[in-house]
């Protein structure tokens, strides 16, 4: 019997009241973004925002609850931009969209920080979210380790220490869009699999490596299958053909995450559409018998207005309950 669970990759839009309040408290300039040493008023505002994001998910009926990552001004680069040995420089485009983040430049050892685990501990969450080691490395600049392989290893060790400090959660989503947008070349693809292993081995939670904005090229996908993880996540909004091909050709894990809700489009899917998309994927890969199917948006949700994000959460929960596998 397949368990069908509704969840998301996290990184939610700030509630409207929080945008206004934090804008007044923080300002509007690059230097006003989160740095890890915020005062009491800003910290309290983010605490209330986190509670609101958790309430959205609980009220919608999601099966896995994230803390929402409301403090992640720099999106997936956040764990580095708040680190004491990282300098933030100019504004860089976030993948191929109209969002921007501060370039994190690593100037010293990536020692344990605890920022993400502290956020997670402050929320009643059942799912953690981290950038995958490869994506975080591609978003950053190294001025300390001096070698791409050593830098990737250091990023993996840094994330593993963070994951090891997490409070107990059911699931950890490692977000790896760069496996699609900037796929690793020969040699690097094997190291990426090992880096993901290093993070996954640090937690007892089920680990989902979630990819989006297309499908992973064949060779990196084959190496990802070697990683000791519970599930791979696929973006069936951006590239259903490429992702079906990978599963048909190389198989996948016993669990799977299906990105069937568009995290960047304000059009809200109906529960019936979501159920049908999950069942369609299952029908394309009859050789696979999944223990668990995570029904999720393909991307983070911060691209959406808050009312649309909330509506998509409700549709996700209802759609997952209507799935018949």
Over which residues does each language-model region extend?
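Domain-level signal for soluble alpha/beta catalytic cores
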Residues: 1-325
